[in-house]
C-alpha cells in the first residue's frame, strides 16, 4: 500500500516557515509516500457596525488580511511544489478557509483522510502550535512535528521513547513505515521519571522488533533533574538519532489543549523530527 501524508500550512496570524516544505518532502520521500499539502487561509467574520466601519474602515482591513492570507497560502504551496518536483514526490494541493478560532479544528478534520500528518514547528509561532496540537489530538492520525531550526536528513536511526503505555505502543505501530526502513532502532526508557511496568520493558520491545527482522537495541537513561522531553532529545541526538517516536500525552478541553509533561517538554524545545501518536 502506498502511503499518503498530509502537510498543513498555516497563513494566519503567523505563516508556516518556508523550510517546512523541504523538510516535509524529505520525510515522505524516505517512505515512498505521496504528499497532500493544504494551505489554511483565514475567513474573518464581519462583526462591525456602521459606526466602527466608518471610523476604523474594518471591512477593508478584513479584506486586506484575508487577501494577504491567501497570497501567503499560494506562496507556501508553490514552495512545496518546487521541493516535491525536485525530490520526485507526487503532490496534490488544496486551499481551505476557516475563521481564526477554527483553523486548528479544520486542519485536524482534513488530516483524517491521510496516513500520517506533517506540521512545521516554531516555538514562537502560535498558528503552528495551534495546528499541531489540534491535529495531534483531533485527527486520529500520527503526527510528525518538523523543527524549523533543523534540516531533515536521512531518518536512518529511529529512537523510540518507551514506557510501556498504550500511547507509546500506538506510536510504535504508527511508526512502522519508518522502522522498516531504519538502519538502526534504539528503544530508550527513562527510569527515574515515573514508575514503570517492569525493569526490562525496553529490551522486551527491542527483542520483539528484532524478531520482526529489525535492527533494534535498548538503552536506559535517567533524567537527572532535566525534563523528560529534554532528556529524551539530548540522548537521541547524542547517539545520532534522526527521528524520535513517542506517545503524545495530553487531552483537549473545549479547544484548550493540555499537554502532558513529556509532550510539552519536547515541543517547548524541538530539536529533531518527532512522531507523536495520541
What are these regions (language model features)?
Residues 1, 42, 78-117, 212-244, ...:
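Structural beta-alpha unit
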Residues 1-60, 138, 154-221, 241:
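Small/aliphatic-rich secondary-structure junction motif
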Residues 21, 26, 30, 105-151, ...:
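Gly/Ser-rich helix-loop-strand patches that form or flank binding pockets
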Residues 35, 90-92, 143, 185, ...:
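Hydrophobic anchor at the start of a short beta-strand
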Residues 40-43, 98, 122-123, 148-150, ...:
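Short, ordered loop/turn segments at secondary-structure junctions
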Residues 59-75:
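A short acidic, glycine-rich active-site loop
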Residues 97-101, 123-125, 165-166:
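Short beta->alpha connector loops
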